[in-house]
């Protein structure tokens, strides 16, 4: 609550369990934090809008263009991509799961400034049938994640998740080839039993066998199991001494939600 208020979310309220149940009768809780301005976005539509905006300002998006190396020479970055050299004054490493592998290919970036990366798969379970809630419901966070919370997409489909499933980190050789296709995004049906138990801590009336496997994602994390949570790492010239370089590492959820604020922070650096 205090963190949210200090970050500018000025409509947060702490309410009793009875007040929460007046808003959401199916909810079981003793105390709640009410955030009336919380909502959802269409992730794909947002990305398409950002792409269109970037292209309208002259950006060129080059997909399937593997980055080999970068070196700062003569006041410009020289990036080798698909056997060709691209030069620029600014280089932003925003490669998500591959951000550490990209950082290791930047000449002059000291190894001790490149953190170890951990990976946590987040599985979601899909609700079959009607959802009694009209708001997003978040339980108290758990180590490694936000807890099994309720999300409702723009089509009205309710899902629960993500859980935290730590997956083995790729070897340096695997990371060097890129992580596309490295992880499995299948949701194991055996995890549904745990989902049901977690959801029933705040929705006691969840019907039996009402959940089905949903979707999954993999989060790049700067800390591993049983370690305190870490914030995003935004690393600029003040940290590494390389002009025009910004590294964005550990950009896990809610990175998409905060993408415009992250972009503003990067803009202030460069």
Q: What residues fall within each predicted segment?
A:
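Dinucleotide-binding Rossmann-like beta1-alpha1 core, especially the glycine-rich loop
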Residues: 1-23, 29, 147-148
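Internal hydrophobic alpha-helix adjacent to the cofactor/substrate pocket in enzyme cavities
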Residues: 259-270
């Amino acid at each position: 609550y205090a963190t949210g208020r200090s970050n500018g979310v000025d409509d947060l309220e702490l309410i009793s369990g009875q007040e929460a149940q007046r808003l959401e009768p199916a909810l079981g809780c003793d105390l709640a934090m009410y955030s009336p301005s919380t909502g959802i976005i269409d992730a794909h539509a947002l990305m398409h809008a950002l792409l269109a905006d970037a292209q309208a300002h002259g950006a060129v998006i080059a997909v399937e263009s593997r980055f080999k190396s970068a070196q700062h020479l003569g006041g410009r970055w020289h990036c080798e991509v698909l056997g060709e050299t691209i030069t620029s004054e600014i280089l932003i490493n925003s490669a998500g799961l591959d951000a550490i592998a990209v950082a290791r290919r930047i000449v002059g970036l000291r190894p001790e400034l490149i953190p170890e990366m951990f990976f946590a798969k987040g599985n979601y379970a899909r609700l079959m049938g009607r959802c009694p809630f009209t708001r997003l419901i978040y339980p108290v966070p758990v180590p490694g994640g936000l807890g099994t919370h309720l999300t409702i997409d723009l089509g009205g489909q309710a899902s629960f998740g993500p859980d935290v499933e730590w997956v083995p980190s790729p070897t340096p050789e695997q990371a060097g080839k890129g992580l596309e296709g490295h992880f499995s995004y299948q949701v194991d049906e055996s995890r549904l039993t745990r989902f049901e138990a977690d959801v029933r801590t705040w929705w006691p009336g969840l019907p039996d066998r009402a959940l089905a496997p949903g979707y999954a994602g993999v989060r790049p994390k700067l800390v591993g199991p049983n370690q305190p949570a870490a914030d995003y790492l935004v690393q600029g010239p003040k940290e590494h001494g390389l002009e025009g370089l910004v590294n964005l590492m550990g950009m896990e959820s809610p990175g998409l939600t905060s993408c415009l604020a992250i972009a503003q922070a990067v803009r202030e650096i460069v």
